[in-house]
């Protein structure tokens, strides 16, 4: 018997994506400000905060909003910290508890100046401060679109918790439909829309909506390829396209990777074709819409680069894995399901 760990091959899905990597020049300064604000709440244990910091969510925001001003980038950095805190806090809870958390956050974004009650989950005050600061620099239309997208995202997090409670594994189509919301892509477009005045007729036009969902799917596929190893190790891989494809088509992991890479190519082509079908709404709106579509188009590259540049999925070996495309299968680890909220365990990956 060989002691060598099994190696997983990660297909190079982004090789032909036309948009390159950009990063905001204000990255280090704004990340430091946002992280200092976030850590001031002491949302995690010392050990989990170290693991959270290695994820470098400020880098994710700086890759996603490379042309943003310092003020707008701060909104992006704060939002990424809020997103992943929601992710960590809700991943270990049952649907009824998640519903309660989500209702707090929905109340916050609709009432950002309302003081939060004593003893409420930290999610309330952290989200309130993020949103109160964000709206100072956001157009009314971008605020409205964010509230709608963030509410859809939050409700889908409850759905994911119900699936977890019932040990329910979806079909590919059903998974992608719900995951398009709970990957958090739509609200993540908001920091790029902060200064735009896109009317609903343009923002919610079927072609634009479809393009935004194409991008969400590309993010899902690349996220699930990168996160599968960590998730199978911690026993949290039911909500992953690779697990679903393996079960639905009765194939192994290698064949599932090939299937996902092929589907990724199809979605890329849908997006590129869809861009040619954008209607005109007049010169002023068209210029803003072009800026918004560019913000969507760079997200898959952002996500792919961050998967390897941060320590979230590959520890300190991300850039090496990005080159070789091979990663050793991590051994199974036990996490303590009784540790919640501030005590939640944020897993540290070490390949």
From Swiss-Prot:
Pfam families: Terpene_syn_C_2 (PF19086). The record marks 84 as: Plays a critical role in the stabilization of intermediate cation. One of its GO terms (molecular function) is metal ion binding. Mg(2+) 3 binds at residues 223, 227, 231. Keywords: Lyase, Magnesium, Metal-binding. The conserved DDXXD and NSE/DTE motifs are important for the catalytic activity, presumably through binding to Mg(2+). It is an enzyme of class 4 (lyase). Gene3D superfamilies: Farnesyl Diphosphate Synthase. It comes from Postia placenta (strain ATCC 44394 / Madison 698-R) (Brown rot fungus). Its EC number is 4.2.3.-, 4.2.3.7. Terpene cyclase that catalyzes the cyclization of farnesyl diphosphate (FPP) to pentalenene as a major product, as well as caryophyllene. (2E,6E)-farnesyl diphosphate binds at residues 312-313. Mg(2+) 2 binds at residue 87. The lineage of its organism: Eukaryota, Fungi, Dikarya, Basidiomycota, Agaricomycotina. A motif (DDXXD motif) lies at residues 87-91. This is Sesquiterpene synthase 14. Mg(2+) 1 binds at residue 87. A motif (NSE/DTE motif) lies at residues 223-231. It catalyses: (2E,6E)-farnesyl diphosphate = pentalenene + diphosphate. GO terms for biological process: isoprenoid biosynthetic process. SUPFAM superfamilies: Terpenoid synthases. Its cofactor is Mg(2+).
């Amino acid at each position: 018997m060989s002691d060598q760990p099994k190696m997983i091959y990660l297909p190079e899905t982004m090789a032909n994506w036309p948009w390159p990597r950009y990063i905001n020049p204000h990255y280090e300064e704004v990340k430091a400000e946002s992280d200092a604000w976030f850590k001031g709440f002491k949302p995690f244990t010392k050990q989990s905060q170290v693991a959270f910091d290695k994820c470098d969510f400020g880098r994710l925001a700086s890759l996603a909003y490379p042309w943003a001003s310092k003020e707008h980038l701060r909104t992006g950095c704060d939002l990424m910290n809020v997103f992943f805190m929601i992710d960590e806090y809700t991943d270990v809870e049952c649907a009824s508890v998640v519903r309660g958390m989500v209702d707090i956050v929905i109340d916050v974004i609709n009432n950002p100046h309302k003081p939060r009650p004593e003893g409420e989950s930290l999610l309330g005050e952290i989200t309130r401060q993020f949103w109160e600061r964000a709206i100072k620099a956001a157009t009314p239309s971008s605020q409205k679109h964010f509230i709608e997208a963030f509410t859809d995202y939050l409700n889908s997090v409850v759905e994911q918790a119900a699936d977890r409670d019932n040990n329910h594994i979806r079909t590919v189509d059903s998974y992608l439909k719900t995951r398009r919301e709970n990957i958090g892509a739509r609200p993540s477009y908001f920091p790029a829309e902060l200064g735009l005045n896109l009317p609903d007729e343009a923002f919610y036009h079927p072609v634009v909506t479809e393009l935004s969902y194409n991008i969400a799917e590309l993010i899902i596929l690349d996220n699930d390829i990168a996160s599968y190893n960590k998730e199978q190790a911690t026993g949290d891989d039911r909500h992953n396209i690779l697990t679903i494809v393996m079960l639905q088509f009765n194939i192994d992991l290698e064949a599932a990777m090939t299937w996902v890479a092929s589907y990724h190519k199809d979605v890329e082509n849908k997006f590129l074709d869809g861009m040619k079908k954008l209607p005109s709404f007049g010169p002023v709106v068209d210029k803003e819409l072009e800026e918004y579509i560019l913000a969507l188009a760079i997200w898959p590259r952002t996500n792919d680069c961050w998967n390897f540049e941060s320590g979230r999925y590959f520890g300190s070996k991300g850039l090496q894995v990005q080159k070789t495309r091979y990663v050793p299968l991590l051994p199974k680890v036990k996490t303590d399901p009784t540790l919640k909220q501030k005590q939640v365990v944020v897993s540290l990956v070490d390949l």
